[in-house]
Structure formats: C-alpha cells, structure tokens
C-alpha cells in the first residue's frame, strides 16, 4: 500500500503538499526570524491531519490533532531559529501549505 500519492515542495521557507493519499508523517525545517509568521492553510477532503510546530529547543509552539475540516492559521515567531513543521496524515486527501510570511 502506498503511503503518499501526490506532490511535495519543501525548503527553508515553505512546505507545500498536495495529495490524493497521505498516510504517513512528514516534516520540514523552516528557518525563521523573530517577528515573522508561519502561515498555514489546510485542505481536508477526507481523512484527518495532525500538525505540530516546534523550535530547535523542542518547545512546541503549535499543536493540533484529528483535524477533519479545512482551515488556516498563523503562528507568530518570537525568536530566531529553526522551526520544524511535522504533519501526519491518516488516510488523508487534500493539501497543506506552510509558508514563511514577513510581518
């Protein structure tokens, strides 16, 4: 059984995934500065998503699980560093976008 069927783009300023099947865990390191924002958009057509964002020190700055509906949110960055975005899909179809936004 495939765990992921779709496309993925990831670098130090964004993670974008568009899929018909996402049934695994993926993560991406974003390099952020204080005052910037991580803008997230989730599209859930079926299945569920879990999202966690944490600093390089392991501090969790955002966490949500069992997400069944589409939505968006922003996470304000309070200190410079690497922020790891971890997304887990359970038989999910849809897309996720996490992008660095300045200001």
Where are these regions (language model features)?
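Edge beta-strands of jelly-roll/beta-sandwich modules across compartments, strongly enriched
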Residues: 86-103
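Transition segment at domain starts
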Residues: 1-30
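Short strand-edge motifs at loop-to-beta-strand transitions and within beta-strands
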Residues: 26-28, 69-75, 83
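Short, hydrophobic/aromatic-rich segments at coil-to-beta transitions
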Residues: 12-15, 37-38, 59-61
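Extended, low-complexity, turn-rich repeat/linker tracts enriched in Gly/Pro/Ser/Thr and Asp/Glu
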Residues: 41-51, 91-94
């Amino acid at each position: 059984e495939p765990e992921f069927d779709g496309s993925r783009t990831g670098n130090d300023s964004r993670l974008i995934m568009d899929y018909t099947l996402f049934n695994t865990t993926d993560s991406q390191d974003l390099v952020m500065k204080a005052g910037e924002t991580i803008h997230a958009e989730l599209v859930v057509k079926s299945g569920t998503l879990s999202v966690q964002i944490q600093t390089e020190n392991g501090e969790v700055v955002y966490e949500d699980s069992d997400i069944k509906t589409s939505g968006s949110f922003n996470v304000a960055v309070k200190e410079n560093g690497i922020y790891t975005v971890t997304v887990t899909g359970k038989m999910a179809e849809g897309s996720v976008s996490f992008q660095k936004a300045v200001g």
